[in-house]
Design a protein with these regions (language model features):
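Surface-exposed interaction regions that form or flank ligand-binding interfaces
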Residues: 1-13, 139-156
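Catalytic cores of nucleic-acid endonucleases
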Residues: 67-145
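Extended low-polarity, hydrophobic cluster-rich segments
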Residues: 24-34, 70-72, 105-108, 146, ...
Length: 156
């Protein structure tokens, strides 16, 4: 790597600088999620069909032995995540989990560099608790908030 590349990596991952388009935040989130799943394949902007037949474009998907293990979304810019955002996230995760390719899906992670509104967190927790608690339907919903140069993850 040349000096420019090393300086850019330092700005993104050490200094945690932000850029207008939110790309640096996305890189940090992708690196964070990939670090949670060792020996797994990390796929970016993956199209995954749900039970509904709709193809969902997932920003980051984790595969192990050809099966999806986790999906993750991140909001890098704009306003804090609201209840409508988490409802859409839940619907996508539920549709993928219920589909042919989601049978081994265990985690759905919603990351944010702009925060979560209180009603959004409550809404996602309620949706998560409304799921059947059997092994076939189990899906862990997690939020990852990036603040003070670190991610804090909360299971909903």
């Amino acid at each position: 790597m040349n000096d420019d590349a090393l300086e850019l990596l330092n700005r993104i991952f050490v200094d945690c600088e932000e850029d207008k388009k939110g790309k640096y935040a996305q890189y940090r989130f992708f690196a964070y999620v990939s670090s949670m799943y060792h020996k797994c394949e990390v796929l970016i902007n993956e199209s995954i069909p749900g039970k509904s037949g709709k193809e969902h474009k997932v920003p980051i998907a984790i595969k192990s032995n050809g099966m999806y293990m986790a999906i993750a979304f991140n909001k890098a810019t704009g306003n804090a995540i609201n209840k409508k955002d988490v409802e859409k996230f839940y619907q996508i995760a539920d549709d993928v989990k219920s589909g042919e390719h989601g049978t081994q899906l265990i985690d759905a992670i919603y990351g944010s560099s702009v925060g979560f509104k209180g009603d959004a967190l409550i809404g996602l927790e309620e949706l998560s608790k409304s799921r059947k608690d059997d092994a076939e339907n189990k899906l862990e919903f997690k939020t990852a908030n990036f603040e003070n140069r670190i991610y804090s993850v909360v299971k909903c």
